Amino acid sequence: MGHVIAVSGKGGVGKTTLCGLLIQYLCENGKHPVLAVDADANANLNEVLGVKPEITLGELREEIERAGVDPRYQIPTGITKQAYLEMRLSDAIAEEDDYDLMVMGRTQGQGCYCFVNGLVQTQVQKLQSHYPYIVVDNEAGMEHISRGILPMMEVAILVSDCSRRGVQAAGRIAKLMNELNFKPQKTGLIVNRVPDGKLDAGTLEEIRNQGLELLGVVPHDDQVYQYDCDGKPIIRLPKDSPVRSALGEIVKKLGL
């Protein structure tokens, strides 16, 4: 069975960037194929990886829901909605050389995400035996944790920036996992965008207050910002990038 790694944290702390670089590290070190899952309704892991999915699970939901009502969405005659869904799910996985990407995406209007969340859960369970590693970029906050979407995760990586709010958000996610009796083999914190790669006393104190294990820090790097501004996939950062080097050391520590 594949090892499930869940990456979570407050919005805006760079968790998706680190998630993409983690996928890259695993692929470059012979841990492929990796199944990358963008479980954030505000999907952008594909941009970090430089991949364009054919269809997201959210779009697939809309296609199924509106079939027979909206002329743009038609299910072939003689096929049930469930059978059509199963047939189309393979189109929701973008295949690359060393990894595949599945994107949750958003639904239109006021539609509930329960169906799409359920698809994420069932697909991860179904595909787990086909990949040595499954890396899930979770929605900002605690949505998938609270709904039990990923009870099978083995490693929970919490990401924060240097702010107290970011660390506190990571602490709340860790506490919620404990309350829901989720028992990853490893749970720890990565602090991202750290000036000069050194944490100040206030941030270290907050990490201790939250009872979090610090896996490591990733330094601030203007090159990441520039790549983002230029629309370049972050995984194209040079190998000697401080961000890639720091994350690589953290992954080695995790024994992945």
Summary of predicted features, one role per range:
Residues V4, P33-L35, Y99-L101, Y133-V135, ...:
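Residue-level preference for the first positions of well-ordered beta-strands
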Residues E28-D97:
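N-terminal phosphate/diphosphate-binding loop that engages ATP/GTP or pyrophosphate donors
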Residues V51-I55, L176-M177, L204-R208, P233-I235:
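Short, hinge-like loop/turn segments at secondary-structure boundaries
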Residues F115-V217, Q226:
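Conserved catalytic-core segment of NTP-binding enzymes
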Residues H3-A41:
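Walker A/P-loop phosphate-binding motif and the immediately C-terminal alpha-helix
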Residues A246-L256:
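C-terminal alpha-helix
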Residues K81-V136:
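Cytosolic-facing regulatory segments adjacent to core modules
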Residues D230-S241:
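C-terminal boundary of histidine-terminating zinc-finger modules
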